[in-house]
Amino acid sequence: MAASVSSVVVLDRGNNTTCTINLHGATIVSWRVNNQEQLFVSKLAVFDGQKSIRGGIPIVFPHFGQWAYGPQHGFARTSRWSVEKQPEPLDNGDIEALFSLVDNPITKQMWNYSFKLVLRVILREKELQVSFNLYNTSVEPFQFNMLFHTYLKVPDVRKCNISGLQGCMYVDKTKENGIYQEPREMVTVNHWTDRIYQNTQQEHVISNVVSGRKMKMIKYNMPDTVIWNPWDVTSNTMSDFGEDEYPNMICVEAGIVITPITLNPNNTYEGTIVLQVM
Ligand SMILES: O=P(O)(O)OC[C@H]1O[C@@H](O)[C@H](O)[C@@H](O)[C@@H]1O
Protein backbone atom coordinates (compact mmCIF):
# COMPACT_ATOMS: atom_id res chain seq x y z
CA MET A 1 0.00 0.00 0.00
CA ALA A 2 1.38 3.44 -0.85
CA ALA A 3 2.23 5.67 2.08
CA SER A 4 0.41 8.98 2.10
CA VAL A 5 0.83 12.20 4.01
CA SER A 6 -1.48 10.81 6.70
CA SER A 7 0.85 7.84 7.26
CA VAL A 8 2.61 9.58 10.10
CA VAL A 9 2.26 9.30 13.86
CA VAL A 10 3.32 12.22 16.04
CA LEU A 11 4.46 12.00 19.64
CA ASP A 12 4.07 15.36 21.35
CA ARG A 13 5.61 16.02 24.75
CA GLY A 14 4.74 19.72 24.88
CA ASN A 15 7.22 22.61 24.72
CA ASN A 16 7.56 22.00 20.98
CA THR A 17 9.21 18.66 21.66
CA THR A 18 7.89 16.14 19.14
CA CYS A 19 8.82 13.01 17.28
CA THR A 20 7.28 12.00 13.97
CA ILE A 21 7.25 8.43 12.67
CA ASN A 22 6.38 7.59 9.08
CA LEU A 23 4.74 4.18 8.86
CA HIS A 24 6.75 3.55 5.70
CA GLY A 25 9.60 1.71 7.38
CA ALA A 26 8.55 3.04 10.80
CA THR A 27 11.12 5.65 9.90
CA ILE A 28 11.57 8.37 12.50
CA VAL A 29 11.54 11.39 10.21
CA SER A 30 11.70 14.16 12.78
CA TRP A 31 12.76 14.69 16.38
CA ARG A 32 12.38 18.24 17.60
CA VAL A 33 13.56 19.33 21.02
CA ASN A 34 12.14 22.72 21.99
CA ASN A 35 11.39 23.24 18.32
CA GLN A 36 14.89 22.43 17.18
CA GLU A 37 15.18 19.62 14.67
CA GLN A 38 17.85 17.06 15.59
CA LEU A 39 17.65 14.74 12.59
CA PHE A 40 18.71 15.28 9.01
CA VAL A 41 16.27 14.49 6.20
CA SER A 42 17.37 15.23 2.66
CA LYS A 43 15.47 17.88 0.73
CA LEU A 44 15.33 15.28 -2.07
CA ALA A 45 13.97 12.47 0.15
CA VAL A 46 11.20 10.53 -1.59
CA PHE A 47 7.94 9.79 0.26
CA ASP A 48 6.30 7.51 -2.28
CA GLY A 49 5.76 4.50 -0.02
CA GLN A 50 8.27 2.57 -2.12
CA LYS A 51 11.75 3.96 -1.70
CA SER A 52 13.41 4.09 1.70
CA ILE A 53 13.35 7.55 3.25
CA ARG A 54 16.69 9.38 2.96
CA GLY A 55 17.20 10.61 6.48
CA GLY A 56 15.85 10.42 10.00
CA ILE A 57 16.23 6.95 11.51
CA PRO A 58 15.49 4.19 8.99
CA ILE A 59 15.60 0.60 10.30
CA VAL A 60 18.00 -1.83 8.67
CA PHE A 61 16.68 -5.41 9.02
CA PRO A 62 17.17 -8.34 8.49
CA HIS A 63 20.28 -7.71 6.41
CA PHE A 64 22.91 -4.95 6.39
CA GLY A 65 24.41 -3.90 3.04
CA GLN A 66 23.91 -5.41 -0.37
CA TRP A 67 21.71 -8.48 -0.25
CA ALA A 68 21.38 -11.31 -2.72
CA TYR A 69 17.74 -11.94 -1.76
CA GLY A 70 16.30 -8.43 -1.53
CA PRO A 71 17.07 -4.70 -1.43
CA GLN A 72 20.17 -3.22 0.19
CA HIS A 73 19.76 -3.02 4.00
CA GLY A 74 16.77 -5.39 3.99
CA PHE A 75 13.03 -4.87 3.79
CA ALA A 76 12.12 -3.25 7.13
CA ARG A 77 12.75 0.28 5.91
CA THR A 78 10.57 -0.20 2.82
CA SER A 79 7.73 -2.13 4.48
CA ARG A 80 4.52 -0.64 5.71
CA TRP A 81 4.42 -0.96 9.53
CA SER A 82 1.37 -1.05 11.79
CA VAL A 83 0.67 1.05 14.83
CA GLU A 84 0.75 -1.35 17.78
CA LYS A 85 -0.02 1.36 20.33
CA GLN A 86 -0.92 4.97 19.58
CA PRO A 87 1.12 7.63 21.43
CA GLU A 88 0.16 7.77 25.08
CA PRO A 89 1.65 9.63 28.02
CA LEU A 90 3.44 7.59 30.68
CA ASP A 91 3.09 8.49 34.35
CA ASN A 92 6.09 10.83 34.18
CA GLY A 93 4.77 12.73 31.15
CA ASP A 94 6.99 11.00 28.59
CA ILE A 95 5.19 9.82 25.47
CA GLU A 96 5.36 6.24 24.24
CA ALA A 97 4.22 4.61 20.99
CA LEU A 98 4.70 1.12 19.55
CA PHE A 99 4.91 -0.04 15.94
CA SER A 100 5.14 -3.52 14.47
CA LEU A 101 6.11 -5.45 11.39
CA VAL A 102 5.12 -9.09 10.94
CA ASP A 103 6.22 -11.50 8.22
CA ASN A 104 4.01 -11.49 5.15
CA PRO A 105 4.18 -12.99 1.64
CA ILE A 106 6.51 -10.20 0.44
CA THR A 107 9.01 -10.58 3.29
CA LYS A 108 8.84 -14.37 3.00
CA GLN A 109 9.86 -14.23 -0.65
CA MET A 110 13.13 -12.66 0.46
CA TRP A 111 13.54 -14.23 3.87
CA ASN A 112 11.47 -17.30 4.49
CA TYR A 113 10.91 -16.91 8.24
CA SER A 114 8.09 -15.90 10.54
CA PHE A 115 8.85 -13.06 12.90
CA LYS A 116 7.42 -10.11 14.74
CA LEU A 117 9.45 -6.94 15.05
CA VAL A 118 8.20 -4.31 17.50
CA LEU A 119 9.58 -0.80 17.66
CA ARG A 120 9.08 1.15 20.87
CA VAL A 121 9.63 4.90 20.79
CA ILE A 122 9.71 6.95 23.98
CA LEU A 123 9.96 10.72 23.77
CA ARG A 124 11.39 12.44 26.83
CA GLU A 125 12.17 16.08 27.51
CA LYS A 126 15.62 15.94 25.94
CA GLU A 127 15.88 12.28 25.00
CA LEU A 128 14.60 9.89 22.41
CA GLN A 129 14.63 6.20 23.22
CA VAL A 130 14.18 3.76 20.35
CA SER A 131 14.04 0.03 21.10
CA PHE A 132 13.30 -3.04 19.05
CA ASN A 133 12.01 -6.42 20.16
CA LEU A 134 12.38 -9.19 17.64
CA TYR A 135 10.43 -12.43 18.17
CA ASN A 136 11.25 -15.56 16.26
CA THR A 137 7.84 -17.10 15.54
CA SER A 138 9.33 -19.62 13.07
CA VAL A 139 9.92 -23.29 13.77
CA GLU A 140 13.64 -22.90 13.06
CA PRO A 141 16.43 -20.52 14.07
CA PHE A 142 17.28 -17.52 11.92
CA GLN A 143 20.14 -15.03 11.70
CA PHE A 144 19.70 -11.29 11.40
CA ASN A 145 21.42 -7.93 11.24
CA MET A 146 19.71 -4.90 12.75
CA LEU A 147 20.72 -1.26 12.74
CA PHE A 148 19.29 2.15 13.48
CA HIS A 149 20.56 4.18 10.52
CA THR A 150 20.59 7.49 12.42
CA TYR A 151 21.14 10.66 10.37
CA LEU A 152 22.08 13.51 12.73
CA LYS A 153 21.67 17.06 11.57
CA VAL A 154 24.86 19.10 11.93
CA PRO A 155 25.90 22.59 10.81
CA ASP A 156 29.27 21.38 9.51
CA VAL A 157 30.31 17.73 9.64
CA ARG A 158 34.01 18.72 9.58
CA LYS A 159 33.58 20.22 13.06
CA CYS A 160 32.08 17.08 14.64
CA ASN A 161 34.05 14.77 16.92
CA ILE A 162 32.81 11.28 17.74
CA SER A 163 33.94 9.45 20.86
CA GLY A 164 33.70 5.78 21.75
CA LEU A 165 35.60 4.31 18.81
CA GLN A 166 39.21 4.33 19.99
CA GLY A 167 40.99 0.99 19.72
CA CYS A 168 38.11 -0.62 17.77
CA MET A 169 38.73 -2.62 14.61
CA TYR A 170 36.80 -1.36 11.61
CA VAL A 171 35.98 -2.38 8.08
CA ASP A 172 36.66 0.51 5.70
CA LYS A 173 34.18 0.22 2.84
CA THR A 174 35.93 3.07 1.02
CA LYS A 175 39.14 1.00 0.95
CA GLU A 176 37.95 -2.32 -0.47
CA ASN A 177 36.76 -3.50 2.93
CA GLY A 178 40.23 -3.30 4.42
CA ILE A 179 40.39 -3.86 8.20
CA TYR A 180 42.07 -1.26 10.39
CA GLN A 181 42.25 -0.21 14.03
CA GLU A 182 41.07 3.23 15.14
CA PRO A 183 43.84 5.06 17.02
CA ARG A 184 41.90 8.28 17.71
CA GLU A 185 40.04 9.12 20.89
CA MET A 186 37.89 11.56 18.92
CA VAL A 187 37.07 10.63 15.34
CA THR A 188 36.58 13.41 12.81
CA VAL A 189 35.11 13.15 9.34
CA ASN A 190 36.87 15.13 6.62
CA HIS A 191 36.26 12.97 3.57
CA TRP A 192 34.09 10.16 2.21
CA THR A 193 33.65 7.88 5.21
CA ASP A 194 31.97 4.48 5.33
CA ARG A 195 33.21 2.38 8.21
CA ILE A 196 31.81 -0.46 10.28
CA TYR A 197 33.39 -0.25 13.73
CA GLN A 198 33.21 -3.48 15.68
CA ASN A 199 32.41 -3.79 19.41
CA THR A 200 32.35 -0.09 20.08
CA GLN A 201 31.90 1.51 23.48
CA GLN A 202 28.40 1.72 24.86
CA GLU A 203 28.30 5.49 24.52
CA HIS A 204 29.21 7.85 21.72
CA VAL A 205 29.28 11.60 22.19
CA ILE A 206 29.04 13.59 18.98
CA SER A 207 30.11 17.22 19.32
CA ASN A 208 28.92 20.22 17.31
CA VAL A 209 25.50 18.97 16.34
CA VAL A 210 22.72 21.57 16.01
CA SER A 211 23.39 24.82 17.90
CA GLY A 212 26.92 23.63 18.61
CA ARG A 213 25.59 21.22 21.26
CA LYS A 214 26.63 17.67 21.97
CA MET A 215 24.54 14.56 21.40
CA LYS A 216 25.04 11.39 23.39
CA MET A 217 24.07 8.03 21.94
CA ILE A 218 23.81 5.17 24.43
CA LYS A 219 23.30 1.72 22.98
CA TYR A 220 22.26 -1.60 24.44
CA ASN A 221 22.71 -5.00 22.76
CA MET A 222 23.90 -3.29 19.61
CA PRO A 223 27.66 -3.91 19.54
CA ASP A 224 28.76 -2.19 16.32
CA THR A 225 28.68 1.36 14.99
CA VAL A 226 28.68 2.48 11.36
CA ILE A 227 29.99 5.96 10.58
CA TRP A 228 28.93 7.21 7.16
CA ASN A 229 29.12 10.40 5.18
CA PRO A 230 28.97 10.18 1.37
CA TRP A 231 30.89 13.45 0.86
CA ASP A 232 30.86 14.90 -2.66
CA VAL A 233 32.51 11.67 -3.80
CA THR A 234 29.36 9.54 -3.69
CA SER A 235 26.55 12.08 -3.09
CA ASN A 236 25.86 12.21 -6.80
CA THR A 237 25.21 8.46 -6.95
CA MET A 238 22.04 8.97 -4.87
CA SER A 239 19.05 10.51 -6.62
CA ASP A 240 17.48 11.37 -3.25
CA PHE A 241 20.40 13.28 -1.74
CA GLY A 242 21.44 16.81 -2.72
CA GLU A 243 25.04 17.24 -3.80
CA ASP A 244 25.42 20.17 -1.40
CA GLU A 245 23.94 18.36 1.63
CA TYR A 246 26.80 16.20 2.86
CA PRO A 247 28.26 18.87 5.21
CA ASN A 248 24.95 18.94 7.11
CA MET A 249 24.67 15.30 8.17
CA ILE A 250 26.54 12.58 9.92
CA CYS A 251 25.31 9.03 10.20
CA VAL A 252 26.20 7.36 13.49
CA GLU A 253 24.45 4.01 13.26
CA ALA A 254 24.29 1.59 16.17
CA GLY A 255 23.67 -1.98 15.15
CA ILE A 256 24.37 -5.67 14.92
CA VAL A 257 26.43 -5.76 11.77
CA ILE A 258 29.68 -7.72 11.80
CA THR A 259 28.35 -10.87 13.48
CA PRO A 260 24.66 -11.58 12.84
CA ILE A 261 22.66 -12.81 15.81
CA THR A 262 21.19 -16.29 15.71
CA LEU A 263 17.73 -16.30 17.26
CA ASN A 264 16.06 -19.58 18.17
CA PRO A 265 12.33 -20.26 17.75
CA ASN A 266 10.16 -18.70 20.47
CA ASN A 267 13.05 -16.50 21.54
CA THR A 268 13.26 -12.75 21.52
CA TYR A 269 16.06 -10.20 21.20
CA GLU A 270 15.90 -6.62 22.38
CA GLY A 271 18.15 -3.69 21.46
CA THR A 272 17.95 0.00 22.26
CA ILE A 273 19.45 3.36 21.50
CA VAL A 274 18.95 6.45 23.60
CA LEU A 275 19.75 9.80 22.01
CA GLN A 276 20.32 12.57 24.50
CA VAL A 277 20.69 16.26 23.78
CA MET A 278 23.41 17.49 26.14
O1 LIG B 1 21.79 4.36 0.08
P1 LIG B 1 21.44 3.48 1.24
O2 LIG B 1 21.02 2.11 0.81
O3 LIG B 1 20.45 4.11 2.16
O4 LIG B 1 22.76 3.28 2.07
C1 LIG B 1 23.43 4.37 2.59
C2 LIG B 1 24.72 3.93 3.27
O5 LIG B 1 24.38 3.22 4.45
C3 LIG B 1 25.50 2.91 5.26
O6 LIG B 1 25.05 2.29 6.42
C4 LIG B 1 26.41 2.00 4.48
O7 LIG B 1 27.55 1.67 5.26
C5 LIG B 1 26.83 2.66 3.19
O8 LIG B 1 27.65 1.79 2.42
C6 LIG B 1 25.60 3.07 2.39
O9 LIG B 1 26.01 3.78 1.25
Task: Report each predicted region and the residues it spans.
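Beta-strand/loop-rich accessory regions of lumenal/periplasmic or secreted enzymes
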Residues: 51-76, 163-169
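Active-site/ligand-binding surface loops and adjacent short beta/alpha elements
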Residues: 141-143, 151-226
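Beta-rich strand-turn-strand
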Residues: 124-128, 138
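Short, hydrophobic/aromatic beta-strand segments
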Residues: 30-32, 140-146
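Extended, loop-rich substrate-binding clefts of extracytoplasmic carbohydrate-active enzymes
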Residues: 71-125
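Active-site pocket scaffolds in enzymes
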Residues: 40-42, 214-277
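Beta-strand-rich N-terminal accessory domains
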Residues: 1-57, 202-223, 267-278
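Asparagine-centered strand-capping/turn motif at beta-strand->loop junctions
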Residues: 21, 132-138, 277
